[in-house]
From Swiss-Prot:
The lineage of its organism: Archaea, Methanobacteriati, Methanobacteriota, Methanomada group, Methanococci. The keyword Ribonucleoprotein applies. NCBIfam families: PRK08561.1 (NF006331). One of its GO terms (biological process) is translation. One of its GO terms (cellular component) is cytosolic small ribosomal subunit. It comes from Methanococcus maripaludis (strain DSM 14266 / JCM 13030 / NBRC 101832 / S2 / LL). GO terms for molecular function: small ribosomal subunit rRNA binding; structural constituent of ribosome. The keyword Transcription regulation does not apply. Belongs to the universal ribosomal protein uS15 family. This is Small ribosomal subunit protein uS15. Part of the 30S ribosomal subunit. The gene is rps15.
């Protein structure tokens, strides 16, 4: 798939092996995995980071294959999932950091263009999440609300 804001071609990536049964070398049970996810969610970690930690430190190749639920759905059941989706939250964090940089360096035109691209991607995501009822219909992005949400 191509890059979003450039004319470059994308790079091909490997696909996850198609597996329907749990590998025999996985030592953790579904209950242990769910408990570990809830424990890490209490510490404030996001679902993508939790998945990476489970893969790298605990040898869990696929949470959904073992538990039957995704990491984010386990976090939602436990009440630790944020009201703003993670991808949108991370983009808002990136935009805030770039705004702080531009306050100190107002002549950095490359970063100004980058901020416009990030904020346009945020607006597209907000439009999608409003359509899928993840965000309320009147939710709007503004740098002030993003700053309040992130901090």
């Amino acid at each position: 798939m191509a890059r979003l804001h450039s004319g470059k071609r994308g790079s091909s990536g490997s696909t996850r092996p198609l597996r329907t049964e749990v590998p025999e070398w996985v030592s953790m049970s579904a209950e242990d995995i769910e408990a570990k996810i809830v424990e890490m969610a209490k510490d404030g970690k996001q679902s993508a980071i939790i998945g990476n930690i489970l893969r790298d430190m605990y040898g869990v190749p696929n949470v959904k294959l073992i538990t039957g639920k995704s990491v984010s759905s386990i976090m939602k059941e436990a009440g630790f999932y944020a009201e703003v989706p993670e991808d949108l939250f991370n983009l808002m964090k990136k935009a805030i950091n770039l705004r702080n940089h531009l306050e100190n360096n107002p002549r950095d035109t490359h970063s100004t263009v980058g901020l416009k691209l990030i904020e346009s991607k945020i607006r597209r995501l907000v439009k999608y999440y409003r359509g899928t009822k993840v965000l309320p219909a009147k939710w709007r992005y503004s740098p002030e609300t993003a700053r309040l949400l992130v901090e």
